[in-house]
Amino acid sequence: MRIAVSGGGTGGHIYPALAFIKEVQRRHPDVEFLYIGTENGLEKKIVERENIPFRAIEITGFKRKLSFENVKTVMRFLKGVKKSKSYLKEFKPDAVIGTGGYVCGPVVYAAAKMGIPTIIHEQNSLPGITNKFLSKYVNKVAICFEEAKSHFPAEKVVFTGNPRASEVVSIKTGRSLTEFGLKDNQKTVLIFGGSRGAAPINRAVIDMQEELKTRPYQVLYITGEVHYEKVTAELKGGKAADNMVTKPFLHQMPEYLQSIDVIVARAGATTIAEITALGIPSVLIPSPYVTANHQEVNAKALSQHDAAIVLKETELSGEKLIAALDKIVMNEETLKDMSERTKSLGVPDAAARLYSIMEDIKK
């Protein structure tokens, strides 16, 4: 069996693709994969690290206003389609899966026009331009939020959830927080502003550090590598709380999530998939800098079920953040109830569901 995969730009498009690849490899050890992305994108480094064959096309995203740059983007798209067709003719895949980001546009479009069975996977509640365009041509559209359904042809839509969920629940033995000098037997909050960090979240944490010193819970705080030196300097200036450990980045984060009681994070699709799969209550701070404000819609999908507290970035402060944490962590009943509600929204078998759709369209 041969499968071509495309998706990139951000980890939110790449990690679901890798989780799906692992699921297929588990079922078919002799499967062959080809990943098509961009030369300069995040996907190249991540995919090649996993020893998956990688081919590149040149493509950029559309600007959301009329510009000459969009004319060039159309030209790159057409060139990308031509290049993708040559890769696909050579590889001869049984199916092609696109996981979003503009890079998968030419690849999946080319595959559909060649009559190869195709699926797109939409991680967010509000779909991006690329997947909306591709939905007219593909066999199936896999979604992670019911809110996304209305944006696609109804007869093509299948709810699968995000394969990243399957990956985090498959980790049987998590790693100990004692690696960071934290206690294994104490309630723990993970604060994480995304791979690049988030300055407004960092400011709120700095502002709440004095209050945090009096709390019976501990914090593992990931600043993002760009912000680490500045943040740690400010924290030390305020004599950082003993019950908080600060790190620039956390590699293999899923391996630590089983030891976390509450998470403070953005509301990206991958984060939502991970916390719902494991039943981790959350304080979500949606990024206002994303397309169509989709993170706010992602967050609402949890908060409307009382599975998360949502704080808007414009209203964020140290006082509000620690109050939200106290509300969850300091009340055992609330913590348990939110954990159950969060877990009820998870789809731990998402990768298997996506695999099943692929098998169906191949027939």
Swiss-Prot record:
Pathway: Cell wall biogenesis; peptidoglycan biosynthesis. Belongs to the glycosyltransferase 28 family. MurG subfamily. It is a peripheral membrane protein. One of its GO terms (cellular component) is plasma membrane. It comes from Bacillus velezensis (strain DSM 23117 / BGSC 10A6 / LMG 26770 / FZB42) (Bacillus amyloliquefaciens subsp. plantarum). Disulfide bonds: none annotated. Its EC number is 2.4.1.227. CDD domains: GT28_MurG (cd03785). Keywords: Cell cycle, Cell division, Cell membrane, Cell shape, Cell wall biogenesis/degradation, Glycosyltransferase, Membrane, Peptidoglycan synthesis, Transferase. This is UDP-N-acetylglucosamine--N-acetylmuramyl-(pentapeptide) pyrophosphoryl-undecaprenol N-acetylglucosamine transferase. GO terms for molecular function: UDP-N-acetyl-D-glucosamine:N-acetylmuramoyl-L-alanyl-D-glutamyl-meso-2,6-diaminopimelyl-D-alanyl-D-alanine-diphosphoundecaprenol 4-beta-N-acetylglucosaminlytransferase activity; undecaprenyldiphospho-muramoylpentapeptide beta-N-acetylglucosaminyltransferase activity. It is found in: Cell membrane. Its main location: membrane. GO terms for biological process: carbohydrate metabolic process; cell division; cell wall organization; lipid glycosylation; peptidoglycan biosynthetic process; regulation of cell shape. Cell wall formation. Catalyzes the transfer of a GlcNAc subunit on undecaprenyl-pyrophosphoryl-MurNAc-pentapeptide (lipid intermediate I) to form undecaprenyl-pyrophosphoryl-MurNAc-(pentapeptide)GlcNAc (lipid intermediate II). It catalyses: di-trans,octa-cis-undecaprenyl diphospho-N-acetyl-alpha-D-muramoyl-L-alanyl-D-glutamyl-meso-2,6-diaminopimeloyl-D-alanyl-D-alanine + UDP-N-acetyl-alpha-D-glucosamine = di-trans,octa-cis-undecaprenyl diphospho-[N-acetyl-alpha-D-glucosaminyl-(1->4)]-N-acetyl-alpha-D-muramoyl-L-alanyl-D-glutamyl-meso-2,6-diaminopimeloyl-D-alanyl-D-alanine + UDP + H(+). UDP-N-acetyl-alpha-D-glucosamine binds at residues 10-12, 124, 195, 295. InterPro entries: GlcNAc_MurG, Glyco_trans_28_C, GlycoTrans_28_N. The keyword tRNA-binding does not apply.
